[in-house]
UniProtKB/Swiss-Prot annotation:
Annotated compartments: Cell membrane
The protein's name: Voltage-dependent anion channel-forming protein RSc3414
PANTHER family: UPF0187 PROTEIN YNEE (PTHR33281), VOLTAGE-DEPENDENT ANION CHANNEL-FORMING PROTEIN YNEE (PTHR33281:SF19)
A Pfam family annotated for this UniProt entry: Bestrophin
A single GO cellular-component term on record: plasma membrane
Lineage, highest ranks first: Bacteria, Pseudomonadati, Pseudomonadota, Betaproteobacteria, Burkholderiales
Key words, A-Z: Cell membrane, Ion transport, Membrane, Transmembrane, Transmembrane helix, Transport
Gene Ontology molecular function, alphabetical: chloride channel activity
UniProt key word Transmembrane helix: yes
The species this protein was found in: Ralstonia nicotianae (strain ATCC BAA-1114 / GMI1000) (Ralstonia solanacearum)
Assigned protein family: Belongs to the anion channel-forming bestrophin (TC 1.A.46) family.
Organism domain of life: Bacteria
Membrane topology: Multi-pass membrane protein
Length: 306
């Protein structure tokens, strides 16, 4: 996730890190070369050519802009829904920690509360690895008791295994008489909300935008940008490469941004900063029981949070 202070309008023009321009440079160079070919064909090799009007390109460009707008909106909806789900995860984790501290009839043993908070703090890390399909071993082994760690690693769905343990913790406190029925109901409501968060994230990961829709827009963008110089060369001559590259940047950048944020749990610069948010959630619940901060592990690296 790109996190930068508000930039002056001129510095914004020169921003490089976090922009999609670096990955587009080879493609824009290709459009530049095609523009030179169009100029050479028009001026030197085929002085008598069929003049292409810019009208068809204008109509196609308008339609393509509308399609790209729909694509970007669909991608941003997925991105924003993912961010709201992780915000809800933070709220639920804080609520459950507060309940563990305030709802029991008598104050629970510090070790019991600390174990509960440790497992709750490990949940976002387990979810992050589940969504990114990475190995959670290092993160979970440092946060979970050995028996629970082995149990979680043996499960296919590690966040669900941690949720099961949290439910068992509530059941055990209820059997001991520390929690009454209303307190158990309050815990269960937040556990249900956490389950909805996990399920919502898994839904986003397992349901991409329709491939046929994405490939249709992708092909149209690149065919349009490759053909555009041949439609402009008659009217603007030597300025064809400049305008062709600029128009290509506008269309290709929109498509590249949509492709990045379509999968919000990835590791590209404009994806959600799940590492940072996992540490933030863990730090938030630790703070409620007086545990020290995790430190500045989540500091931005060249304005990029991962």
């Amino acid at each position: 996730m790109v996190v930068r202070p508000h930039l002056h309008w001129f510095r914004m023009l020169l921003a490089w890190r976090g922009s999609v321009l670096p990955q587009l440079l080879p493609r824009l160079f290709l459009i530049f070369c095609i523009s030179l070919v169009a100029m050479a064909v028009h001026v030197h090799w085929l002085p008598i050519t069929v003049n292409l009007s810019t009208t068809p390109f204008s109509l196609i460009g308008i339609a393509l802009a509308v399609f790209l707008g729909f694509r970007n909106n669909a991608s941003y909806d997925r991105y924003w829904e993912a961010r709201k789900l992780w915000g809800q995860l933070l709220n639920d984790a804080r609520s459950m920690t507060r309940q563990a501290l305030t709802l029991p009839r008598e104050t629970l043993a510090a070790a019991d509360v600390r174990e509960f908070v440790q497992v709750l703090g490990a949940l976002p890390h387990a979810l992050r690895h589940q969504l990114r399909r990475t190995d959670p071993r290092d993160d979970l082994s440092a946060r979970l008791p050995a028996p629970l760690f082995e149990r979680v690693m043996a499960s296919r769905y590690r966040p669900a295994a941690l949720m099961l343990w949290l439910g068992e913790w509530v059941r055990q406190r209820s059997r001991e008489g520390s929690l009454d029925a209303w307190a158990v109901l309050a815990f269960d409501r937040n556990l249900g909300s956490l389950s909805n968060v996990i399920g919502g994230c898994e839904r986003i990961v397992s349901t991409p935008l329709p491939f046929a829709y994405s490939v249709m827009i992708h092909r149209t963008v690149y065919f349009f940008c490759a053909a555009l110089p041949f439609g402009l060369v008659e009217s603007i001559g030597n300025f064809t490469p400049v305008f062709s590259v600029f128009v290509a940047y506008a269309f290709m950048a929109h498509e590249a941004i949509a492709a990045q944020i379509e999968e919000p749990f990835g590791t590209e610069d404009n994806d959600l900063a799940l590492n940072t948010m996992s540490l933030m959630i863990e730090d938030a619940v630790r703070d409620l029981i007086g545990e020290p901060s995790l430190g500045d592990e989540a500091a931005a690296r060249a304005f990029i949070l991962d």
